[in-house]
């Protein structure tokens, strides 16, 4: 946990494997804290928005990118945006297309918040991001469960074939999990088993955020 003394906003990072329940627990905390801090005082930022722009590459080249490696992400821009939000400045968050494998021309404007929830697979691998967090979480969901969830999500929501999902899992998802993501849980303040519906973990996180807000 960072000893960050900037009180403009509280940043909570939620990391873990793809389809481990990060988005679910982030959205649950977001929805349940809105009544406490106000609709416009809490926001969620997904690390996926900061995949590097690949518009200069052909589609064939884009699909070969290893999206589970830290080099695929623009963490420098993410850090800059978080620092701007902590200074009370609005930022333009990129939007990423999972079907085009690059950023779109649109941006999402985020105004300063009291609480920002970050979620993404590689957040805890970067010391710059860890230093900006007031609390960090790792979703410790078994990989076989993550794979089943990911396959269903990517086929239903992202236009992928089952064959391409399993091929990507074997070539990059699992190896990168073992090399980068799983070791990063040593940096987490809280390790959450059983996925995003872990009610005790949700309540602990909400209570901790509430304490930080009162500090």
From Swiss-Prot:
Subcellular locations according to the entry = Cytoplasm
CDD domains named in the record:
UMPK (cd02023)
Q: Does the keyword Kinase apply?
A: yes
Q: Which reaction does it catalyse?
A: uridine + ATP = UMP + ADP + H(+); cytidine + ATP = CMP + ADP + H(+)
Superkingdom of the source?
A: Bacteria
A GO biological process held by the record: CTP salvage
Query: Its pathway?
Result: Pyrimidine metabolism; CTP biosynthesis via salvage pathway; CTP from cytidine: step 1/3; Pyrimidine metabolism; UMP biosynthesis via salvage pathway; UMP from uridine: step 1/1
Please verify whether the record's keywords include Nucleotide-binding. yes
Q: Which GO terms describe its cellular component?
A: cytoplasm
Instruction: Write out the residues that bind ATP.
Output: 16-23
- The enzyme's main class, written as a single word, is transferase
Location (main, coarse): cytoplasm
Which HAMAP family does the record match to this protein?
A: Uridine_kinase
Q: Name it.
A: Uridine kinase
Native source species? Aliivibrio fischeri (strain ATCC 700601 / ES114) (Vibrio fischeri)
Name of the coding gene: udk
């Amino acid at each position: 946990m960072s000893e960050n003394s900037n009180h403009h906003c509280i940043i909570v990072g939620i990391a873990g494997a793809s389809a481990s329940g990060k988005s679910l627990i982030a959205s649950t905390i977001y929805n349940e804290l809105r009544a406490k801090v106000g609709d416009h005082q809490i926001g969620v930022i997904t690390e996926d928005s900061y995949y590097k722009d690949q518009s200069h590459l052909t589609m064939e080249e884009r699909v070969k990118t290893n999206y589970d490696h830290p080099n695929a992400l623009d963490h420098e821009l993410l850090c800059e945006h978080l620092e701007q939000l902590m200074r009370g400045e609005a930022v333009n968050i990129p939007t990423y297309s999972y079907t085009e494998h690059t950023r779109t021309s649109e941006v999402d404007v985020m105004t300063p918040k009291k609480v920002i929830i970050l979620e993404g697979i590689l957040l805890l691998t970067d010391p710059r991001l860890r230093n900006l967090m007031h609390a960090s979480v790792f979703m410790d969901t078994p990989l076989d469960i993550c794979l089943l969830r990911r396959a269903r999500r990517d086929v239903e929501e992202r236009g992928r074939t089952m064959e391409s999902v399993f091929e990507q899992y074997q070539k990059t998802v699992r190896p990168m999990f073992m090399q980068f993501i799983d070791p990063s849980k040593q940096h987490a303040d809280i390790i959450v088993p059983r996925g995003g519906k872990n009610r005790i973990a949700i309540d602990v996180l909400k209570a901790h955020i509430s304490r930080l807000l009162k500090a």
